[in-house]
Each structure stands twice: as structure tokens, then as C-alpha cells.
Amino acid sequence: MRRIFILLCLLMVWTESALAAGNLGVLWDWQAPGEKESRRVQGEKLPGIDVLSPSWFIIENAQGKIKNRHGSVKYVRQAHNKGYQVWALITNNFAPKMTSKLLDSPLARKMVIAQMEQLGKDYELDGFNLDFENINPADKDKLTDFVEEISKALKHQGLIISIDVTIPSNSGYWSKCYDLKAIAEVVDYMMLMAYDEHGAGSEVSGSVASLPWVEDGIQKTLQEGVPEAKLILGMPLYMRLWQETKGKVKAKTLS
């Protein structure tokens, strides 16, 4: 997810195939560096949540080496015992130059996939959530190919593949890097990050995700060719407290 100070992001979809139940709730479980235990698998199961997506893995260089931050079989087994699936999050660390070099290298891409296959086995995962962001739009087709390669390889293990995308906009590195229709054809789910309408650095105060803005974003995404049954709406469980002084604004994030 784009901003690391977001502690939680609740993602929900209504679809006929979602866990064979019709409703799917996914909770992004961000674990801070050094955090050994997650609160999400402690205590009672959260109502309406079917999947936990812990922030465990980072592609840390152009050779495709994956850094394991928090991977835990104990976490997965606790989650399974409570009735959750676990889709571990893997990120490109929002590093556009590194990502370009990685996408240019068939060997590096194969290395990433091989490690993901092993991580899926080692941690008894149900799937992966791909959080690939801040990518050069010139790498758009290579990104699509890479996601397809990941999906084909890991589906042989029975793993679910989802990917995080932004609301369609004119932003090159944050939006136009995604071929939404083509990517939707090769993944199981597409997580639409319906935030931030007004970011922390905004020059005007406003909502993080107002209803009209979110609805418009959903429609734009569907118009790009993403099937409704694959679209997961990502909603922020945080807000901003704005302060205006002499025509300037600053924000404090609350979660």
C-alpha cells in the first residue's frame, strides 16, 4: 500500500466466486519493522474478514532478491485456525529504477517467481498480494507480462494472486503504468486503492475518500475492462485532521 503510515486497510468485494460464499473481506495487516507478533491473529476472529494480507516480503534489488521481513508459519497457522486465508503482500518497495531493471531481466523475473513459489510452500500460504507501485509507464507492458508469469507459475500451486492498483488518473508512475484490462485477465482479484483523494501533502484540505470520488473511481476502473467479479474495493481506515493557517494547510493522520 502506498503510504506506510496506514496501519490498516479494509478491502471488500461482493462476488459470486469469493471464497464460494459471495462476500470477501480482506484486511491488510501492516507490520512495523521489528514487530514480532501481529495483533490481527490474536484474540477472536474479526467479523466479516476472510483474508489477512501481512506485509512480509520486499523485492529489494534488480537481481530479484526478496527480503523476508516478517514471514511466520506460526502466524499462518493461527490465522488458518481462526478461519482466515493468508495472502502475503510482496512489494517492489516503490522503487521505479530498480523495478525497470528487474523487468528488463528475464533471469531476475524468474528468480522472483522461484522465491515466491518456495515462500508459498514454506509458509503454507493461500496466495500473494502484489503491491507493485511507482513504476515507469514505459514499463507498462513488461509489468503486465511479469504479473502474468507470476500468476501462471503460482496458480500451479493453487495460490490466489491479487494486485493493488490505483484509481485511473493522469499520473504516469502511479496510474498509467497499469494495463488494467490485461492485468485483470491474469489475476484472481484486483484491489482498487480508493485513497487518497487528498493526500498529506495536498495544498487544500479535503476527504481521504469521499463517496462521489470513490464511486467515480470504481466506474472508471470498470470502464477500463476490469470485471466486477474481480474488483475489490480498498477503503482507508484512517482520516486526516486538517489545520488551516494563513491560507496554508497541514494534515495530521489519525488511524
Where on the chain are the PLM-derived regions?
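Mature extracellular/periplasmic domains of secretome proteins
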Residues: R40-L46, I113, E117, C177-V186, ...
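Glycan-recognition patch characteristic of GH18 chitinases/ENGases
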Residues: A21-M116
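Active-site beta-loop-alpha junctions enriched in small/polar residues
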Residues: W30-G34, F57, T91-N93, E133-I135, ...
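Hydrophobic faces of well-ordered beta-strands that scaffold small-molecule active sites
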Residues: N23-D29, D50-P54, V86-I90, F128-L130, ...
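Substrate-binding surface in catalytic domains of secreted glycosidases
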Residues: Q63-I66, H70, P137-S255
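Sec/Tat signal peptide C-region and signal peptidase I cleavage site
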Residues: E16-A20
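Active-site groove signature of glycoside hydrolases
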Residues: W56, I113-K142, L192-V204
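Sec-dependent N-terminal signal peptides
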Residues: I4-V13
